[in-house]
């Protein structure tokens, strides 16, 4: 919840759930409301109404969203619902018919209109209350930079295109203008996100825009080069493994952007990948990983996988483990397959029992632990730059270029009580465990 106190203007509470892309949507809504003079309340009791930005990607997310709506209704009584679950308004209204309004994802205008209807805005706007970078829900030193909306893929387990539509890329000058504003406000790290980051500009046929008086194509490699000129960390997330991704690796080796790729491979059995409607040439993927690391040895690769997908046999799962052994990925997340209403995968034969899905997920994560630890051990004894997150009497917690916020590990600095949150620092790595590095500050 976000808090700003005022006794003279209408107050809106806000609950933001889901992925970083939803966080960006929440920030846009909050910025619009603040610009119109609404105050942002940090409590249900103090708010005149509450907006809940939902997630609907898997069943657990739907349940969490419905619970959050119910809590807001119980504590406040006036609730507007938006976000991915909002695309299924029948589900929301069946559970909570008393909500004031329901909109889908990426619907700032519709949310603001609903707020106007149920809580009329002040007569005069208060644009002076808005910082140039807008309202943000992340710490001051990093920000998510969303470059597109929607997705052109039709992965059989996913319903994102039905909720957020096909790919719509933001004009490159808009992206760069926002990035510059964020950096000017003190942001030290830009996390580039979308549903399909690699496809940026495909829908616009890589149209040429302009930034700082020079032409700039609406294409990921060109955007990455431009962002790399801003003097901050630039981290790439949700990178679909197109061949064009290869172009990013030299930029990472040169230090223009962080040597970090978040690539959701999802599986390694060609048969299961075909059923998922994902690229299925596993040998090609392994060869590309080897090539990436030959160009940029410090590259960190994060990926996610699904266990227990319909039709997955013991041999399919063993293929996945063999892939992990060969690929030596740095960071891995795994999800037991969960049927999502409306997903094509629901119609596939041979569903895997729930307990087997979860058992395979746990086996995969246990298998990956040794690999992740070995990948971290290579940093011991090296001097690295970290971005400090928190400092207290017991020391500091930071992140390295290999660690995205909330999903990866940390750098623990026991003697770091003199460091400054939100600033870069030089440290020497002294030890590691499965997820985290340990370090001491350098003079």
UniProtKB/Swiss-Prot annotation:
A biological-process GO annotation: tRNA modification
Organism lineage string: Bacteria, Pseudomonadati, Pseudomonadota, Betaproteobacteria, Rhodocyclales
The TRAM domain, residue ranges: 377-443
Residues of the MTTase N-terminal domain: 10-120
Residue ranges constituting the Radical SAM core domain according to the UniProt record: 137-375
Task performed by this protein: Catalyzes the methylthiolation of an aspartic acid residue of ribosomal protein uS12.
GO cellular component: cytosol
Protein name: Ribosomal protein uS12 methylthiotransferase RimO
Positions that bind [4Fe-4S] cluster 2: 151, 155, 158
Cofactor binding summary note: Binds 2 [4Fe-4S] clusters. One cluster is coordinated with 3 cysteines and an exchangeable S-adenosyl-L-methionine.
PROSITE patterns per record: MTTASE_N, MTTASE_RADICAL, RADICAL_SAM, TRAM
Keyword Iron-sulfur: yes
Gene Ontology molecular function: 4 iron, 4 sulfur cluster binding; aspartic acid methylthiotransferase activity; metal ion binding; protein methylthiotransferase activity
Protein EC: 2.8.4.4
Family under the similarity heading: Belongs to the methylthiotransferase family. RimO subfamily.
Intracellular or extracellular location(s): Cytoplasm
Catalysed conversion reaction: L-aspartate(89)-[ribosomal protein uS12]-hydrogen + (sulfur carrier)-SH + AH2 + 2 S-adenosyl-L-methionine = 3-methylsulfanyl-L-aspartate(89)-[ribosomal protein uS12]-hydrogen + (sulfur carrier)-H + 5'-deoxyadenosine + L-methionine + A + S-adenosyl-L-homocysteine + 2 H(+)
Alphabetical UniProt keywords: 4Fe-4S, Cytoplasm, Iron, Iron-sulfur, Metal-binding, S-adenosyl-L-methionine, Transferase
């Amino acid at each position: 919840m976000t808090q700003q106190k005022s006794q003279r203007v209408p107050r809106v509470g806000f609950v933001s759930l889901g992925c970083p892309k939803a966080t960006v949507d929440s920030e846009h809504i909050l910025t619009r409301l603040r610009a119109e003079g609404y105050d942002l309340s940090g409590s249900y009791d103090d708010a005149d109404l509450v907006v809940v930005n939902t997630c609907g990607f898997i069943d657990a997310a739907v349940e969490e969203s419905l619970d959050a709506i119910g809590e807001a209704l119980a504590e406040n009584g006036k609730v507007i619902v938006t976000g991915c679950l909002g695309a299924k308004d029948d589900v929301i209204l069946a559970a909570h018919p008393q909500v004031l309004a329901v909109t889908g994802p990426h619907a700032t205008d519709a949310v603001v209109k609903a707020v106007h209807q149920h809580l009329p805005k002040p007569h005069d706007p208060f644009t002076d209350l808005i910082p140039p970078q807008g309202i943000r829900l992340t710490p001051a030193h990093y920000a998510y930079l969303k470059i597109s909306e929607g997705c052109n893929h039709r992965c059989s387990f996913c319903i994102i295109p039905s909720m957020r539509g096909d790919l719509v890329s933001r004009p490159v000058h808009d992206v760069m203008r926002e990035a510059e504003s964020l950096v000017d406000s003190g942001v030290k790290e830009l996390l580039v996100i979308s549903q399909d980051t690699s496809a940026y500009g495909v829908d616009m046929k890589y149209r040429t825009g302009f930034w700082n008086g020079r032409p700039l194509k609406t294409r990921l490699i060109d955007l990455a080069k431009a962002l790399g000129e801003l003097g901050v960390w630039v981290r790439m997330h949700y990178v679909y493994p197109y061949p064009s991704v290869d172009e990013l690796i030299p930029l990472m080796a040169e230090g223009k952007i962080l040597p970090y790729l978040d690539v959701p491979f999802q599986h390694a059995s060609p048969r299961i990948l075909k059923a998922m409607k994902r690229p299925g040439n596993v040998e090609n993927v392994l060869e590309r990983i080897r090539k990436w690391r030959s160009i940029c040895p410090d590259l960190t690769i994060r990926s996610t996988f699904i266990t227990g997908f319909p039709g997955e046999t013991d041999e399919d799962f063993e293929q996945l483990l063999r892939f992990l052994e060969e690929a030596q990925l740095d960071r891995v997340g795994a999800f037991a397959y969960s049927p999502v209403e409306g997903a094509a995968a629901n119609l596939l034969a041979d569903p895997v029992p729930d307990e087997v899905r979860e058992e395979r997920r746990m086996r995969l994560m246990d298998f990956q632990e040794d690999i992740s630890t070995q990948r971290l051990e290579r940093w011991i004894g090296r001097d690295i730059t970290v971005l400090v997150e928190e400092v207290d009497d017991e020391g500091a917690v930071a992140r390295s270029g290999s660690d995205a916020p909330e999903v990866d590990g940390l750098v623990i600095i026991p003697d770091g009580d003199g460091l400054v949150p939100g600033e870069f620092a030089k440290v020497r790595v002294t030890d590691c465990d499965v997820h985290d590095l340990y370090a001491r500050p350098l003079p």
